């Protein structure tokens, strides 16, 4: 459903941002005016069709005829992106859109091997939309020795920085990532570990639902301290120093089943779900334990899950609140970031920061696919 956002009539300099995250639950799109403080003009969320979602999930693992299936899936995703763009422009017809920032769908992320793969067909999207498209945001950073992720900390700094006290912004999509903001310092950021990627997969495997609405299913279970301890202490990734990133390549159902088997525990599915909620909170708490932050703002799908928000509030010594509390709807923050990243590319401003990704230096991120 497209949502026009009331605001000033001046159409300004506008960009569209499109994001389909690790959870693969849908495509989020925003139309953002960026001639000053970012101003949200319209937003849209489109479900990913079940057949496309199944294909994208399958492409996260090796299989037959991958290149052919990946190309077809990328084209289908681009058509869905084009639908989102059309709805956004219809909601704010006065806006003059300079470019689209289209992230694509991550199916492999291996910066340790020098590559990251986001399925996308930006040339097709440019053709269908008639608008210049900026895409392939991660590869340039990986080529410079960086993690290629997370990409949102510079945008978090633009939106939530400058408050005079250290704070953090946590994005809880499929994978959690945190941005550390301190007065007079460049933002730092890194992935914290699994969030919705495991919660959604486990819920779907045992209930048939794509996600645990409001954490209601998890609330019927109890946290297993033994399983939580096993997960936190048997996975080497959690102890890696920042900068670091991860994805479904590591934290999928196979990872969870492996650790459930090695733990020797026999738990109900609800208890496992409750423990995964606690795992999300504890990995965040461990990751920022040494940081003198005064508050934590949360965005992404996890911010709409009361079970996760309550677990974070218990695990952290500082106030925890959704970004909505500062007038920025948490559902749209990541899509807004890719509109902002598209502007940064058009203006040739480096958005890949060494303090976030570990790259050899700042880099301009993205590649341009002109509409004509």
Swiss-Prot record:
SUPFAM superfamilies, sorted: Actin-like ATPase domain (SSF53067)
Reaction catalyzed: 1,6-anhydro-N-acetyl-beta-muramate + ATP + H2O = N-acetyl-D-muramate 6-phosphate + ADP + H(+)
Coiled-coil residue windows: none
Binding site for ATP: 21-28
Keyword Kinase: yes
Cystine connections: none
Keywords associated with the record: ATP-binding, Carbohydrate metabolism, Kinase, Nucleotide-binding, Transferase
Pfam family of the protein (one): AnmK
E.C. code: 2.7.1.170
GO BP term (any one): 1,6-anhydro-N-acetyl-beta-muramic acid catabolic process
An annotated Gene Ontology molecular function: ATP binding
Pathway in which the depicted protein is active: Amino-sugar metabolism; 1,6-anhydro-N-acetylmuramate degradation; Cell wall biogenesis; peptidoglycan recycling
InterPro entries named in the record: Anhydro_N_Ac-Mur_kinase, ATPase_NBD
Task performed by this protein: Catalyzes the specific phosphorylation of 1,6-anhydro-N-acetylmuramic acid (anhMurNAc) with the simultaneous cleavage of the 1,6-anhydro ring, generating MurNAc-6-P. Is required for the utilization of anhMurNAc either imported from the medium or derived from its own cell wall murein, and thus plays a role in cell wall recycling.
Homology family: Belongs to the anhydro-N-acetylmuramic acid kinase family.
Protein name per UniProt: Anhydro-N-acetylmuramic acid kinase
Lineage: Bacteria, Pseudomonadati, Pseudomonadota, Betaproteobacteria, Burkholderiales
């Amino acid at each position: 459903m497209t949502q026009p956002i009331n605001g000033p009539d001046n159409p300004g300099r506008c960009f569209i941002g499109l994001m389909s995250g690790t959870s693969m639950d849908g495509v989020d799109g925003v139309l953002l005016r960026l001639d000053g403080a970012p101003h949200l003009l319209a937003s849209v969320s489109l479900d990913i069709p079940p057949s496309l979602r199944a294909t994208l999930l399958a492409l996260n693992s090796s299989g037959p005829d991958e290149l052919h299936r990946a190309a077809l899936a990328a084209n289908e995703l681009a058509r869905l992106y084009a639908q989102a763009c059309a709805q956004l422009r219809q909601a704010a017809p006065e806006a003059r859109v300079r470019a689209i920032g289209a992230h694509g769908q991550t199916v492999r992320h291996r910066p340790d091997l020098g590559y990251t793969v986001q399925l996308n067909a930006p040339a097709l999207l440019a053709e269908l939309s008639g608008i210049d498209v900026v895409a392939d945001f991660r590869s340039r950073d990986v080529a410079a020795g960086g993690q290629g992720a997370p990409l949102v900390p510079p945008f978090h700094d633009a939106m939530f920085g400058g408050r005079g006290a250290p704070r953090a912004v946590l994005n809880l999509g499929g994978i959690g990532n945190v941005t550390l903001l301190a007065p007079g310092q460049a933002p730092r950021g890194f992935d914290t570990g699994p969030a919705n990627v495991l919660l959604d997969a486990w819920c779907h495997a045992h209930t048939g639902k794509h996600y645990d609405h409001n954490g209601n299913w998890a609330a019927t279970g109890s946290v297993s301290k033994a399983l939580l301890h096993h997960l936190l202490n048997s996975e080497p990734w959690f102890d890696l120093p920042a900068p670091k990133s991860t994805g479904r390549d590591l934290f999928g159902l196979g990872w969870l089943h492996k650790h459930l088997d090695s733990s020797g525990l026999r738990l109900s599915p609800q208890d496992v779900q409750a423990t995964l909620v606690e795992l999300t909170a504890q990995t965040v708490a461990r990751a920022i334990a040494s940081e003198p932050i005064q508050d934590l703002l949360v965005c992404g799908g996890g911010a709409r899950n009361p079970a996760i928000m309550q677990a974070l509030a218990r695990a952290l010594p500082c106030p925890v609140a959704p970004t909505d509390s500062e007038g920025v709807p948490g559902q749209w923050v990541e899509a807004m970031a890719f509109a902002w990243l598209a502007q940064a590319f058009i203006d040739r401003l480096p958005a890949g920061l060494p303090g976030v990704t570990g790259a050899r230096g700042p880099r301009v991120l993205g590649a341009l696919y002109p509409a004509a």
